[in-house]
């Protein structure tokens, strides 16, 4: 799998800032990748998209989207996942017959990192209206939002009240 989120300039800059102590020791984080689902952008759009077929895809939103955020958070934090818990479910997506699809359309994982930080990763195919491809990292000296602000790639809110803005690039999107 090509881990394309590592190539995003804001993720590289965030990694550099975190390693330099810009937000102190990382305590917790949340990372999200959610959109309206592959039927809205795939080469074979609609309710018969291969992503929904368990015999072809095996897994859903977790494998499609979550794998990228799982890799990205380890890259940005410079830490490895040592323990995880997950809930995968199908809440809304239906196939051409009207039945719930055979793979997950939503997944939430709790990660424990080898540096002691804990956080969540959410992958969803049922974020209707606007894609969310953001990460927020909470440290002892501040909070870093990565692609969480519509105007700035990275925003760091410092414990002392200061705010730093970094404009590197826009996040990749599946939006039409």
Label every PLM stretch briefly.
Residues 28-43, 48, 143-146, 150-168:
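Mobile, glycine-enriched helix-loop/loop "lid" segments at the mouths of ligand-binding/catalytic clefts
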Residues 22, 58, 140, 159-160:
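Intrinsically disordered, low-complexity segments enriched in small/polar residues
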Residues 116, 135, 145, 163-176:
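C-terminal helical cap and adjacent loop that interface with cofactors, partners, or active-site loops
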Residues 37-47, 63-73, 118-129, 161-171:
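Hydrophobic transmembrane alpha-helix bundles
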Residues 70-155:
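Contiguous beta-strand/loop segments that form the cofactor/metal-binding neighborhood of enzyme cores
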Residues 5-100:
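Predominantly a Rossmann-like dinucleotide-binding segment in NAD(P)-dependent oxidoreductases
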Residues 18-19, 43-44, 136-139, 163-164, ...:
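Short, charged/polar low-complexity linear motifs in solvent-exposed/disordered segments
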């Amino acid at each position: 799998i090509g881990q394309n989120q590592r190539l995003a300039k804001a993720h590289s800059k965030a990694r550099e800032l975190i390693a330099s102590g810009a937000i102190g020791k990382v305590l917790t984080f949340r990372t999200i990748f959610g959109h309206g689902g592959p039927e809205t952008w795939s080469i074979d759009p609609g309710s018969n998209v291969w992503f929904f077929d368990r015999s072809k895809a095996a897994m859903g939103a977790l494998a499609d989207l979550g794998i990228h955020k799982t890799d990205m958070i380890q890259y940005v934090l410079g830490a490895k996942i040592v323990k995880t818990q997950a809930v995968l479910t199908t809440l809304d997506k239906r196939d051409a017959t009207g039945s719930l699809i055979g793979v997950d359309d939503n997944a939430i994982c709790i990660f424990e990192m080898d540096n002691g930080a804990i956080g969540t990763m959410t992958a969803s195919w049922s974020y209707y209206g606007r894609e969310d491809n953001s990460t927020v990292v909470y440290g002892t000296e501040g909070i870093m939002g990565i692609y969480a602000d519509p105007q700035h790639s990275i925003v760091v809110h410092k414990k002392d009240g200061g705010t730093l803005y970094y404009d590197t690039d826009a996040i990749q999107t599946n939006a039409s």
